[in-house]
Amino acid sequence: NVTSKKVKQSFTADELKIGDYFYSDGTWSDGGLRKIYTDGSMKIASPKPAPVLQTKSEIERRVIGIVFQTDPSRIGTAEKSKLGEGNVHGLVMALKNTATDIQWSHEENNLEDVKDCWSKSEIYSDISGLHNYTKILDHANSIGGIEAYPAFEAVEKWNDMYSINEYRPPRNTTGWFIPSSGQWWDILQNLGGCPAMADKGQQTSSDYGDFRWLGQGDVP
């Protein structure tokens, strides 16, 4: 019974929030989220709003991503530094993969500036994908080129502002990057609808090694 649930946060159509559509011109529109409950479940408007593919000025635009986080405390320092503390409003997951079946790297390296995450709490707390992405790019360039990191090379091709790629990022963004483990957590919790991800006990757990969640019900 939804009425028995405790509401954590409510939203109106004109507020930027999880699930909103993000467009090629850097704008966004309502994706239908109206309430988040304390158990991590959500209430979506019915009918769910459709993308608005034409601006009021009748200019065409494309959906290139979906907002998965707007909580400032879950947005990394590097992301905030890139655009300025007050200019970061949310994080967006791309609609399409840059590539499929592509290798992360041709080499194995433990970089000092990129944290190894083992426990659930470490995974949850690692929220700056842009930091990790930038440090790995710096390392790749220092050893002669990004070709040794195919996944990163694919992302950088998307970030090429002079390419004809339809998913290149708007100029008022950080550009695309590979999410950190904590950002993947937020994607699974906020867009994937996995109840365990919203559990404070899981977010602060010291469990590490190989583990998996079972019996989480249907994912929307």
How should these model regions be labeled?
Residues V2-N172:
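Short, compositionally biased
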Residues G144-F177, S181-P220:
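An exposed tryptophan-centered "aromatic clamp" motif
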